[in-house]
Regions:
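RNase H-like, Mg2+-dependent phosphodiesterase core
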Residues: 1-198
Length: 198
């Protein structure tokens, strides 16, 4: 992983390039999170990689390192009600836009993980598997995942029967069994449960 995507954007004349990624599109419960991160070009952060390939402990450590070293960052989310109202894709776009809007300093070019460009106030590009190719996107994936995981741990205390601390809302066997036994709670995505609960 290197800064080639960021570097290309700077060569085009852009002055502030950030990476944006999401966490939590697939779970049956809880919000979808996104983060936007503007790193100093060339900054080396050991072990920076796609958040899904890192242990929870490593992600937590990198979360602080990224926030301390970023030129600017922003975190945003869309909750389960918004996901049910506008669908998960649009809710993900909303979370990404909120993350961008929450940055301490504005960027003028965005690198988005995936193959679909959300509506953004500035130009940018999509990068498939960007969280494994761009340090800015990798950093964003970590901020988004850790932020969402922390929220799900709080929900685990509120709704202990679902064991959100174990699966963070994903459709594991334990989670699906709890849904059949107890039914959904207020943070479940109703549109995601139709196939499971009928």
């Amino acid at each position: 992983m290197d800064y080639s995507f960021e570097h290309e954007a700077y060569l085009k004349g852009y002055t502030a390039v950030c990476g944006i990624d999401e966490a939590g599109r697939g779970p049956l419960a809880g919000p979808v999170y996104a983060a936007a991160v503007w790193l100093p070009e060339g900054l080396v952060i050991d072990s920076l990689n796609d958040s899904k390939k890192l242990s929870e402990k490593k992600r937590e450590a990198l979360f602080d390192v990224i926030k301390e070293n970023a030129v600017a960052y922003g975190i945003g989310f869309a909750d389960e009600k918004e996901i049910d109202e506008i669908n998960i894709l649009q809710a993900t776009y909303l979370a990404m836009r909120r993350a961008y809007d929450n940055m301490q300093k504005a960027c003028d070019y965005v690198l988005i993980d995936g193959n679909r460009m959300p509506p953004m106030p500035v130009p940018g590009e999509t990068i498939v598997k960007g969280d494994a190719k761009s340090p800015s996107i990798a950093a964003a994936s970590i901020l988004a995942k850790v932020s969402r995981d922390r929220v799900m741990l709080e929900y685990a205390k509120q709704y202990p029967v679902y064991h959100f601390e174990k699966h963070k809302g994903y459709g594991t066997k334990v989670h699906v069994e709890a849904l059949h036994e107890f039914g959904p709670c207020p943070i479940h995505r109703k549109t995601f449960l139709k196939k499971i609960l009928g």
